[in-house]
Amino acid sequence: MEIILKEDVVNLGYKNDIVTVKSGYGRNYLIPTGKAVIASPSAKKMLAEELKQRAHKLEKIKKDAEALAAKLEGVSLTIATKVSSTGTIFGSVGNIQIAEELAKLGHEIDRKIIVVKDAVKEVGAYKAIVKLHKEVSVEIPFEVVAE
């Protein structure tokens, strides 16, 4: 029996895969629980159309991410914080402060996609990575200075 999986099934396949299973497994478990549908010609046609539309959407999202990456390419940030006499920062500089500085420049970036590798606890120059898409990321240099 050929079926189309509606979600990932362990040891069988991933969502939208067309797989062959024993009739009892398909009729008594996969189809009643909503994990699969019978792979009729019309269902296969609908699946192909859905995958085509999804690919088009993903391509558009990637193009938008690449356009934003091009805008962020030349950006350099300066973050002013309170500093002790030894040059250490009170607290630390993280993705929240970088997102705020980018917002001041007109780039609304979610703080969750900004990655700072090491804890920034001293004055100096550092780099942050903005992961706009799984295939598109931008490295933004930033400098921490005394307020």
Swiss-Prot record:
One annotated GO molecular function: rRNA binding
Keyword Nucleotide-binding tagged: no
Single GO cellular component term: ribosome
Alphabetized InterPro entries for the sequence: Ribosomal_bL9, Ribosomal_bL9/RNase_H1_N, Ribosomal_bL9_bac/chp, Ribosomal_bL9_C, Ribosomal_bL9_C_sf, Ribosomal_bL9_N, Ribosomal_bL9_N_sf
UniProtKB keywords: Ribonucleoprotein, Ribosomal protein, RNA-binding, rRNA-binding
GO biological process: translation
Family, similarity comment: Belongs to the bacterial ribosomal protein bL9 family.
Alphabetized HAMAP family for the sequence: Ribosomal_bL9
Function (record text): Binds to the 23S rRNA.
Protein name as annotated: Large ribosomal subunit protein bL9
Record organism: Bacteroides fragilis (strain ATCC 25285 / DSM 2151 / CCUG 4856 / JCM 11019 / LMG 10263 / NCTC 9343 / Onslow / VPI 2553 / EN-2)
